[in-house]
Amino acid sequence: MNSDLPAAKPVSSNESMTIERIQGTDGIRGPVCRLEDSSSSNPLDALLNEGVMTEEFFELYTYAYCQELLGADFASAHDLVVIGWDPRDLSGRFNEAAVRGIRKAGLTAVVVDILPTPAISLYQLHVRAACAFVLTASHNPAGQNGIKIF
């Protein structure tokens, strides 16, 4: 263990919640809510201070990742990006927001709708897409969602 790093400080019950790790191995998942239902004024504050992801965060996340692909020359304008999801977002708001982020970045969203995660990553390879997003929280409770990246 590196002794130059500060020790982790536990959050007391009267402090706002902060998350220690934003992204896991292949994405992010956790509780979701509408931004207007949170006490935050923007999606990053909602994530960092309340630990919740909003539909605006889904758009920002896919947009930022696609911009990174473009900036690193792993993708070119209008390249394909596959996106699919599990059935937990009954309103479709989070799914639509993630698709908006891809399109806003200048890439082409190939929407495959509801498919199992392995099928989406295989389809990405089949169509030679720059990347794929799967909107799922896997085995987490229904009030949660997530974004996996392939």
Language model regions located:
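An N-terminal, well-structured beta->alpha segment
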Residues: 1-98, 104-105
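Ferredoxin-reductase
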Residues: 70-150
